[in-house]
A protein has these predicted regions:
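N-terminal first-folded block
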Residues: 2-32
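Short alpha-helical
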Residues: 13, 47, 69, 73
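Glycine-rich beta-strand-turn "strand-cap" elements at beta-sheet edges
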Residues: 2, 40-48, 75-94
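Short, well-ordered beta-strand segments in beta-rich or mixed alpha/beta enzyme
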Residues: 2-9, 38-66
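An amphipathic, aromatic/His-enriched active-site/gating alpha helix that lines ligand/cofactor pockets
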Residues: 24, 28-36, 55-89
Length: 94
């Protein structure tokens, strides 16, 4: 299994718009990507900060995820609300 822990900071005042778009992405991933075993959005206790927790069966599932139209289009939409680049920690199960 492969996993990612992604931290995203959003511009103040854009939280609701970011959440709406991110929740749409979560729903589409969960409904259509069998190789993705976990795709979850959480709000941090830090202001304007969110985390995605992702878990995939293998590298092919990660590649499939990144190639989907919903990832590309909704990812672009989320970008307008972000305050800087996301911080991505990639993990491999031992």
């Amino acid at each position: 299994m492969l996993a990612a822990f992604v931290t995203i900071k959003v511009k103040p005042g854009s939280e609701a718009d970011f959440e709406k778009t991110a929740k749409e992405l979560v729903a589409k991933v969960q409904a259509s990507e069998p190789g993705c075993k976990l795709y979850e959005l959480s709000r941090s206790d830090q202001p304007h900060t969110y985390h995605f927790m992702e878990r995939y069966v293998d590298q092919d599932a990660v590649a499939t995820h990144r190639a989907t139209e919903h990832y590309k289009s909704l990812g672009r939409q989320m970008g307008q609300y972000m305050d800087g680049a996301p911080v991505i920690i990639r993990l491999t199960e031992v």
